[in-house]
Amino acid sequence: MEQMSVTQFAGELKMPASVLLEQLQKAGVEKTGADQLLTEQDKARLLEYLRRSHGQSQPKGKITLTRKQTSEIRATDSSGRARTVQVEVRKKRVFMKRDEVSAETGSLESAQIEEETAGLPMGEIEPTPEPENIVEPVAEAIPEPEPVREPEPEPEPIVEPEPEPEPEPEPEPQPEPEPRPEPEPATVESGAPAKPEAPVRAPSRPPLRVSILSDEERAAREREARRHQELRARQAADLKAKQDREAAARAAAEARRAEEEARVRAEAERRAEAAKPQPKEAAKAPAGTLHRPAKTEEKPAGKDAKRTARGDTAGESAKRRGLKTRGEVGATTGSWRGARGGGRRGAQDEHKSFQAPTEPVVREIHVPETISVADLAHKMSVKAAEVIKILMKMGSMVTINQVLDQETAMILVEEMGHKAFAAKLDDPDTYLESAEAHHDAAVEPRAPVVTVMGHVDHGKTSLLDYIRRAKVASGEAGGITQHIGAYHVETPRGMLTFLDTPGHEAFTAMRARGAKATDIVILVVAADDGVMPQTREAIHHAKAANVPLVVAVNKIDKPDANPDRVKQELVAEGVLPEEYGGDVMFINVSAKTGVGIDSLLEAVLLQAEVLELTAPVDSPAKGLIIEARLDKGRGPVASLLVLSGTLRKGDVMLVGATFGRIRAMLDENGKAIDHAGPSIPVEVLGLSDVPAAGDEAIALADEKKAREIALFRQGKYREVKLAKQQAAKLESMFEQMAEGEVKTLPLIIKADVQGSQEALVQALNKLSTDEVRVNAIHSAVGAISESDVNLAQASGAVIIGFNTRADAGARKLAETFGVDIRYYNIIYDAVDEVKAALSGMLAPERRENVIGLVEVRQVFKVPKVGTVAGCYVLEGVVKRGSQVRVLRNHVVIHNGELESLKRFKDDVKEVKFGFECGLSIRNFNDVQEGDQLEVFEIQEIARTL
């Protein structure tokens, strides 16, 4: 072996060289310098000294080896995903000397036997004090020379940590006692090499072994084994008794719970029997089925016993394998993972041991306006497949995501045995109702809202122009009103608010909105024209709204004016003047000259005084959207008539499915205002989208609540719209299958305001017939955009712009794609052109036109040609290729076509009246003399709507 210096050895031991030199000198090794070399004997002496000083003079009796092995396995977790788990296996092996093994298996009696052998020589007994480490009494009983060594541990407590690693590596490479394998083959490396006492220890063991295996020791071992066996048996008996007690307690608890449930059910059945006396036998049945819980008494106990036994076996096998586990992971409480299989079943059995026959559960289902099949199934707690089956039996083929309307859903719920209610449980509109109930502001008189109605061209706008001293009518396209206008006028007797409605038949919805918001209706009738269709419609609107009428007979300055005839016609419509005993005032006026205008205003104000119109002023505003449009620069603009309260700039408004904070308010002249009271018409800016004309507007204090209600309404309208579209698609599909293909004219309609848009769509849809149909793919308010052109190109539609124009990008795109864009300012022109286009799509009418009559004089049979008839033209003309009808005795026997026409031997195109000719009929040879041939042509005549 290589020798090393004191400095090198100190470096290995991680200690100063000076300290090591001191320890070497105390151990009897004469080393004075750090560069001197150390031999193996010097190291052994130092080791022996250190052991003596720390009370470990004797060699180690046992060696412990620990081995750690790490590996990886792939396992699935509770969610089913594969995971890599690191497994660390630690093995610990203890090697002991044979005499130590025998000493450990013995009890305290073995120590006494060793005391008896104390007469042996001291050198033989001295090497065997190993039992000292295990049994303390032996060390006290033998007066060994250990007390002499005890005073030596005083020096260097500092060195105590350093020499600890030294003894461990030292004993293993030196298995010096080679002569010993014969007496002790089981002994592995001894713990004390290089000791002079080691050879003396070998002969001392056989006599010691003989003394240990004596009869007394054997008897002592048997007694100890019996005692351990009795102890284990007693512990097993206690454990079994405890398990039996727990199982019996559980079984008793189950039985008590089952009896209690049976008693409660029997009581319920008895009460039900008292309420309806028919099912008497059924009520007795639960009381008689008390044998069922009795059966379940032993069942849990048996299962628990089996489970316990299984758990014990599993635990023992796990211990035998020596694997480190997380412990019991069965169905015990507090375990980190639920039990697999049986554990969960056991837990369920404890709770569900008793089940009485259940009656079908009848639920109260609140059905909204629209609901999907899946949501409805969830409400009824059934699978969606069951709902689809019932719907298929009812004749509807649906999918799980299909939306059902309220009526169908309620029928389905009743069909499945539940109770259906039409409900709006989560409707935030209830917030508005509760908010209205809390506002009890003082009411004040307000100005009347007057709507001017009548037939087109009867002078409504001209009448208002004279009252307002304005010239609106002269600036309107075509001289007709196509928008609803709102104006307020100050008169000496008070303020009046006028609504001017269109008179054209297409604007029915506008007139209905005007009647809804009004207090008084002025019915304008031209004295030279009388009562017309829209006049009658205006009367109906006024009566439906329960609004008083004032009739203005206009154009009395014309020569052919006849006010009395107008009165008679209105009486026929149920409008009685005051002079006839009615309650309607008739005023003769002329919007051109101003005759009777003051009398008309006085009559209106008188009627308003009778009505005593009032409205709260200091409260949140409520109003009605008269008209709405999309302005390119300002966004959505809504014309609003305030009905009650005061509307201020900055208020949060909720209008139908739109909301927003008012950024600006304008009066009818375009001037900015800050607030508007009752009966004042204003234009508001700041809404999130273009509202629908006729929607009710309300001012709210909470913008968050306004947004919530608007979004709810949007979702509701969308669901209803989708449900209607789906139904319409199915209906139209069946219609097309039944009637054949219907030609459609796809249109995209863009208008300046909402009212014009809906009026135009309605007027164009009225043009549809069974053969041709107008399909308004998209209709909206605003300018024609590129998205409209793209949609038109994809669907092959024509774009109609009513009082709007296409922007530059849209025009360029339309030229590229060849999309047709038509602009109109007058609704008549738009309707007429679409009508003409639909007429062109109609299949032409086929009409027969008889052009001649010929008589067969002679018949010739020509080979390879067939029958040729020699004829005389009695009337008209005969043309080659014309259709002919063969008449025999004035009865039609054949319809066909002329194949050839000849005069003498020449082919001719036609033969006129009074000439003879020869002809043959295609695929017909049964021509006889005396037959007459009627020659005709089929003309196609274009149809109109």
Curated annotation (Swiss-Prot):
Region G5, annotated ranges: 590-592
Annotated positions binding GTP: 454-461, 500-504, 554-557
Region called G3, residue ranges: 500-503
InterPro entries in alphabetical order: DNA-bd_dom_put_sf, EF-G-like_DII, EFTu-like_2, IF2_assoc_dom_bac, IF2_II, IF2_N, P-loop_NTPase, Small_GTP-bd
Compartments where located: Cytoplasm
Compositional bias of kind Acidic residues: 153-175
Principal localisation: cytoplasm
Basic and acidic residues bias (residue ranges): 215-283, 294-310
UniProt keyword Lyase, yes or no: no
GO cellular component entries: cytosol
Keywords in alphabetical order: Cytoplasm, GTP-binding, Initiation factor, Nucleotide-binding, Protein biosynthesis
GO molecular function: GTP binding; GTPase activity; guanosine tetraphosphate binding; translation initiation factor activity
Residue span of region G1: 454-461
Pfam families found in the cross-reference section: EF-G_D2, GTP_EFTU, GTP_EFTU_D2, IF-2, IF2_assoc, IF2_N
Annotated segments matching region Disordered: 52-80, 96-357
Region annotated G2, chain positions: 479-483
Cystine pairs: none
Nucleotide-binding keyword on record: yes
Highest taxon, organism lineage: Bacteria
Region G4, annotated ranges: 554-557
Entries under NCBIfam families matching the protein: IF-2, small_GTP
HAMAP family documented for this protein: IF_2_B
Membership in a protein family: Belongs to the TRAFAC class translation factor GTPase superfamily. Classic translation factor GTPase family. IF-2 subfamily.
Function: One of the essential components for the initiation of protein synthesis. Protects formylmethionyl-tRNA from spontaneous hydrolysis and promotes its binding to the 30S ribosomal subunits. Also involved in the hydrolysis of GTP during the formation of the 70S ribosomal complex.
Protein name in the entry: Translation initiation factor IF-2
Gene that this sequence comes from: infB
